[in-house]
């Protein structure tokens, strides 16, 4: 007769065996359905089953892997990522994949970034509260841009004076770290006003959350998904993410309490103003949706802070030996501000600056794919491409480097989009920094393209205007950028040092 322990062991063995057989059957079914789409990796059978070699190749060299995949099939190829196999469609599928029919962005993001784990909510907030986020950005944030042009200029000026200094002697700064602090200050001032914009700890936590959070996601990925609800309680990196969120709540709670008291009439003097706290509160009430105010604010940091910093850093690196371009950009800026003053209209007329920004984004987008989704029902696409339910899919951004679309696509040309605008009214319409086409997908494409790109554009112009007018900059002799490829992400040289010195600006900006 079997003992109780023997019975438990036998049941456990049956459960494990059943789980393994079920997973094997699912693996076989999936690969049978998707067999027509080639694998970009050149792997033997064992390396296809045990995916470590493939995921390492994906992590360090997706750009080359993408070239190999598209050479095998221009329509679609498969790649082994560190969170599962994914189908990458050619860039010409952007139009076909711009909607949500049979596709889910929110579910994909939650799975990729583990947004269902406690403490990781800022990674899934936008997907779980899509209407709330979209309305806040398009109806409230974008309408505040005229006011923010002045307010952010003041914050940028203050940050530069204290951190880049007013010394006219050449001195070195860690470029990425300095720009991160600058972007964080400008962003927090836009969303939460001067009180938190001058709170250094809040700024630090906003900058840290994405870095620590993404690090935790990568650390948890090797674990089987069914164990994550248990593992995250003990994993030190997951606990570090929760600690940051907890400290953010501690900073935010007294502010929220004062706002509530002011609205109830307990406190006559109210600090309530036109900030993102108001926007979320009012929009959420109008659509009948509950939300976490602290998570909502950190979501902005996750969505834009690091990508904007990366882009600004890359722009300055791209301009390192372009003294004539820098001089022309300064001249344009002086002419526009002298004529228009400092306002949203003036910023919209900085065409060379826009071309510079768009060209750096084209050359090095922070993400080499767009429209990442989970397929929620079997999909039949054009050219006989079949995507089975449950598969991961994305669209390649390769058209931004296609020589049939862009002349000398691997060469940086600061004037590229100015020249493109001169080709005719239609070209001019789609040559602006925030314009989106299937050939220019730096902000995504379709229903889930970045709704805050007008804000990003203005914030970057404010920052670049102050830097160009107030500072000379150069990089060490012989400097070669050392960017990092990390899967789909293309990251700028975060270790770059830049030499700067104060210059006498030709026109004064607010601040």
From Swiss-Prot:
Q: Which CDD domains match?
A: CYP503A1-like
One cellular-component annotation, GO = membrane
Chief subcellular site?
A: membrane
Glycosylation positions? 64, 163, 343
Its function, per the record, reads: Cytochrome P450 monooxygenase; part of the 2 gene clusters that mediate the biosynthesis of fusicoccins, diterpene glucosides that display phytohormone-like activity and function as potent activators of plasma membrane H(+)-ATPases in plants by modifying 14-3-3 proteins and cause the plant disease constriction canker.
The family assignment reads: Belongs to the cytochrome P450 family.
- The protein in question is named Fusicocca-1,10(14)-diene-8beta,16-diol C-9 hydroxylase
């Amino acid at each position: 007769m079997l003992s109780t322990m023997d019975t438990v062991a036998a049941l456990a063995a049956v459960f494990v065996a059943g789980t393994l057989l079920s997973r094997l059957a699912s693996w076989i079914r999936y690969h049978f359905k998707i067999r027509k789409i080639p694998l970009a990796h050149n792997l033997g059978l064992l390396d296809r089953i045990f995916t470590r070699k493939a995921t390492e190749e994906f992590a360090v060299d997706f750009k080359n892997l993408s070239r190999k995949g598209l050479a095998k099939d221009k329509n679609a190829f498969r790649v082994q990522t560190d969170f599962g196999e994914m189908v990458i469609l050619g860039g010409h599928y952007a139009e076909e994949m711009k909607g949500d029919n049979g596709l889910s962005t929110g579910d994909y993001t939650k799975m990729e970034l583990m947004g269902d784990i406690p403490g990781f909510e800022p990674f899934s907030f936008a997907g779980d509260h899509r209407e709330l986020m979209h309305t806040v950005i398009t109806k409230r944030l974008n309408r505040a841009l005229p006011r923010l042009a002045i307010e952010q200029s003041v914050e940028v000026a203050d940050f530069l004076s204290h951190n880049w200094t007013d010394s006219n002697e050449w001195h070195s700064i860690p470029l990425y770290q300095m720009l991160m602090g600058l972007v964080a200050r400008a962003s927090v001032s836009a969303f939460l006003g001067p009180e938190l914009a001058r709170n250094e700890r809040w700024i630090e936590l906003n900058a840290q959350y994405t870095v620590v959070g993404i690090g935790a996601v990568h650390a948890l990925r090797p674990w089987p998904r069914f164990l994550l609800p248990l593992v995250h309680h003990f994993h030190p990196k997951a606990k570090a993410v929760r600690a940051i969120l907890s400290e953010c709540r501690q900073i935010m709670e007294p502010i929220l309490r004062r706002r509530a008291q002011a609205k109830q009439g307990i406190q006559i003097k109210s600090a309530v103003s036109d900030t993102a706290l108001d926007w979320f509160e009012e929009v959420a009430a109008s659509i009948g949706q509950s939300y976490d105010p602290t998570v909502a604010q950190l979501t902005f940091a996750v969505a834009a802070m690091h990508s904007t910093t990366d882009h600004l850093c890359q722009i300055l690196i791209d301009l390192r030996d372009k003294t004539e371009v820098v001089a022309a950009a300064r001249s344009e800026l002086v002419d526009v501000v002298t004529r228009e003053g400092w306002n949203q209209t003036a910023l919209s007329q900085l065409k060379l600056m826009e071309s510079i920004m768009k060209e750096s984004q084209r050359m090095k987008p922070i993400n080499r794919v767009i429209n990442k989704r989970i397929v929620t029902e079997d999909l039949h696409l054009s050219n006989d491409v079949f995507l089975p339910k449950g598969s991961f899919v994305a669209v390649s951004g390769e058209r931004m480097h296609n020589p049939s679309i862009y002349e000398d696509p691997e060469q940086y040309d600061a004037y590229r989009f100015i020249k493109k605008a001169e080709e005719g009214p239609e070209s001019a319409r789609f040559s602006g920094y925030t314009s989106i086409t299937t050939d220019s997908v730096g902000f995504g494409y379709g229903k889930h393209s970045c709704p805050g790109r007008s804000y990003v554009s203005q914030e970057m112009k404010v920052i670049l205007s102050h830097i160009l007018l107030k500072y000379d900059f150069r990089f060490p002799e012989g400097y070669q950028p050392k960017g990092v490829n990390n899967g789909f992400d293309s990251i700028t040289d975060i270790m770059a040092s830049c030499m700067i010195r104060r210059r006498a600006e030709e026109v004064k900006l607010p601040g």
